Amino acid sequence: VPAGVDDAAKVKAEFLAKVAKGEESCALISKGKAAELLGTMLGGYNVKPLIDVLGDAEVGAIAAEGLKKTLLVFDFFHDVAELAKCGNANAKAVMQSWADGEWFTSRPEVPASQKLTVFKVTGETNTDDLSPAPDAWSRPDIPLHALAMLKNPRPGIEADEAGSRGPIKQLEKLAAKGNLIAYVGDVVGTGSSRKSATNSVLWFTGEDIPFVPNKRFGGVCLGSKIAPIFFNTMEDAGALPIEIDCGQMDMGDEIELKVDAATAKVTALKNGTVIAESQLKTAVIMDEVR
């Protein structure tokens, strides 16, 4: 069940709130587990139930841990502040954590070096290649819609079923090498702005988001040229888009990508030999990915 503020999230939050408060019991989920799961819902319907149990001796500390990593609290901030003023130790801990930015500092830094397997798409890829208009009906279902990515024949891309299903088997073979896959292209993401295009790329190149189904984040996208709108959309999704010469990167290559956070210098190596160098568009992108 998704986090956030859709109808399903409301039902999820209301049920977990009742269990966390002890108003309902569930053989599969304890009070503590219910509070922990509420704390994974990112904001919205989960915020008030978490605040309501901050004074609970059994689950208050668990609720505090969830709130520490929740940013989308809006006016409920004042409720936590008021509880802290009244001496609630868990509320005080949440306020201090927010002040210290632990929601950010607790996350792992972007690795200075990472091994990637190249999924190379030669020539120009536009957003309709990545998220075909005839498949627009499936865009809300990211894993389903991703099956249509690159479904039309093009050099080097082995569609499972030309015109209907993209190179899923080819991508699975690359994933079997054990590294994250990098989407690599000559010109990437031209055409109209489509978040669905980014979603499809990240489905195959990103990592699961804890407690959020059917969506991924992170991933690396390398392009000799990346269209500005696509670059920004990748950035917003927590991916690492880098403009770098991809001429010596071929389908299936295992490369090492080094990023120096201090200088924003990017180095790509194949078999230990430097094959391309570049600069991040902004050093801040390392913090954005984190």
Show which residues each predicted segment covers.
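Internal alpha/beta core interface subdomains
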Residues: 279-290
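Short inter-helical turns and helix N-cap capping residues of alpha-solenoid HEAT/ARM repeat scaffolds
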Residues: 26-27, 55-59, 87-88
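N-terminal, positively charged, Ser/Thr/Ala/Gly-biased leader segments
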Residues: 82-147, 290
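Feature captures the catalytic cores and cofactor-binding loops of soluble hydro-lyases/lyases
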Residues: 137-275, 283
